[in-house]
Design a protein with these regions (language model features):
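A cross-kingdom feature that marks ATP-driven nucleic-acid transaction machinery
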Residues: 1-106
């Protein structure tokens, strides 16, 4: 049934985003803090910027680790990829899953 999808929805969504990033020629990295349980799903570096990326499989998009990472690294702007529409906040942008290619090709 749907139990497998429900249980692994986050992992499937992260895998989809990873495949999209690789298809765009980007080289994503993973980051975790050894002192706390925080993690950033992907760190992308292109010619102009470093982008910490948090992937959310649902519309419940609290991104505490991303917020803390941005707080600890002033000057960076985070990217959250989720099922929600586009939102631009001072510290982070949210883009829908279907807009990954468009976002990085600009």
């Amino acid at each position: 049934g749907d139990n497998v999808f429900t249980e692994f929805k986050g992992a499937f969504t992260e895998q989809y985003v990873l495949q999209q990033l690789l298809a765009l020629g980007l080289k994503p990295y993973y980051w975790s803090n050894t002192k706390t349980p925080s993690e950033i799903d992907f760190i992308i570096q292109d010619s102009q910027r470093v982008i910490p990326v948090e992937v959310k499989a649902e519309e419940n998009v609290r991104a505490k680790s991303l917020a803390q990472f941005i707080k600890d690294n002033p000057g960076l702007k985070g990217l959250r990829i989720s099922m929600k529409g586009y939102v631009d906040q001072e510290w982070m942008e949210n883009i829908p899953l279907i807009a990954i290619g468009t976002y990085f090709e600009r």
